[in-house]
Design a protein with these regions (language model features):
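Polybasic/polar functional segments that serve as interface/processing modules
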Residues: 1-73
Length: 73
């Protein structure tokens, strides 16, 4: 069975969600959050209709990872 082609906006969606996730991380760090604090991050799968959230501890989040690193499915 052939794999469906990626939607043309998928790379942009991944980048935007990565910016949101990094901003969430930076804000938590700025506010003095503990490294063991669980936070919800947006799925970076690239699908516009995706609303999945991924719970990670602050210490599990890799700020330098590329867009598309956090995927729920």
């Amino acid at each position: 069975m052939p794999v469906a082609a990626e939607h043309p906006t998928a790379p942009r969606v991944r980048r935007v969600r990565r910016v949101v996730n990094v901003t969430t991380f930076d804000l938590a760090i700025t506010q003095g959050a503990d490294a063991d604090l669980p936070l919800e991050f947006m799925c970076e799968c690239g699908r516009v209709e995706c609303t999945e959230q991924i719970v990670l501890l602050l210490r599990q989040f890799d700020r330098s990872a590329p867009a598309g690193s956090i995927v729920a499915h």
